[in-house]
């Protein structure tokens, strides 16, 4: 089994030979031959080895631009100090010591709280460890104090014997925050019947942000 990671616009492809690297199934593989993939921070500088950053890529088959959309094209491009052109993917990732790329989150979903990057996927993974949680999505909402603060929308498990063991929102909040770093702690938890999703199953986090009233 061979898995490919890339964009329709080009900008670099990663390949994972799953049968050859069973210990790397959590990654999207390594850059294909002739493809250059790098990670950059919010300022556009390349990140240090082992650090997370936005995935940008260069490949022989990159698009020249979006048709009649020069501004959108410029927003999608990144150039290294030597003038080499890359395409921004919008994904946040990290390379391991062997050069395998792990995707962490989407850049648009990154929460910047008190000047620190908070990755929703990290918080979601913790909440999914709770036996009463069936599904979860974490979003950043405006905060006068922190700029943004994380809020979790949680779908509780249903079924025989589940109703009596369902946690209250305050109980679940305390449980989660005791397992998170101080800078990651959730502001609140909202229970929801189901997460809004697109036709292809992606969680519509914009709708969740719109549902929540900004905290102080």
Regions found by a protein language model. Name each.
Residues 14-18, 40-41, 58, 155:
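Short beta-strand-to-turn element immediately C-terminal to the catalytic PLP-Schiff-base lysine
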Residues 2-9, 28-31, 139-142, 190:
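Beta-strand->loop->alpha-helix junctions that form or flank phosphate-binding loops
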């Amino acid at each position: 089994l061979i898995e490919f990671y890339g964009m329709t616009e080009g900008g670099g492809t990663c390949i994972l030979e799953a049968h050859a690297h069973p210990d790397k199934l959590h990654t999207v593989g390594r850059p294909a031959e002739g493809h250059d993939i790098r990670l950059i921070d919010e300022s556009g500088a390349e990140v240090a080895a082992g650090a997370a950053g936005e995935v940008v890529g260069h490949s022989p088959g990159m698009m020249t631009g979006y048709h009649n959309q020069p501004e959108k094209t410029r927003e999608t491009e990144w150039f290294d100090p030597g003038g080499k052109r890359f395409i921004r993917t919008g994904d946040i990732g990290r390379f391991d010591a062997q050069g395998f790329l792990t995707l962490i989150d989407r850049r648009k979903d990154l929460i910047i709280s008190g000047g620190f990057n908070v990755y929703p996927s990290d918080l979601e993974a913790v909440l999914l460890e709770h036996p009463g949680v069936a599904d979860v999505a974490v979003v950043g909402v405006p905060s006068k104090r922190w700029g943004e603060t994380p809020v979790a929308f949680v779908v509780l498990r249903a079924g025989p014997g589940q109703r009596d063991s369902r946690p209250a929102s305050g109980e679940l909040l305390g449980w989660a925050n005791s397992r998170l770093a101080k800078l990651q702690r959730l502001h609140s938890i909202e229970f929801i019947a189901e997460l809004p999703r697109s036709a292809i199953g992606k969680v519509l986090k914009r709708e969740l942000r719109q549902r929540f009233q900004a905290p102080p």
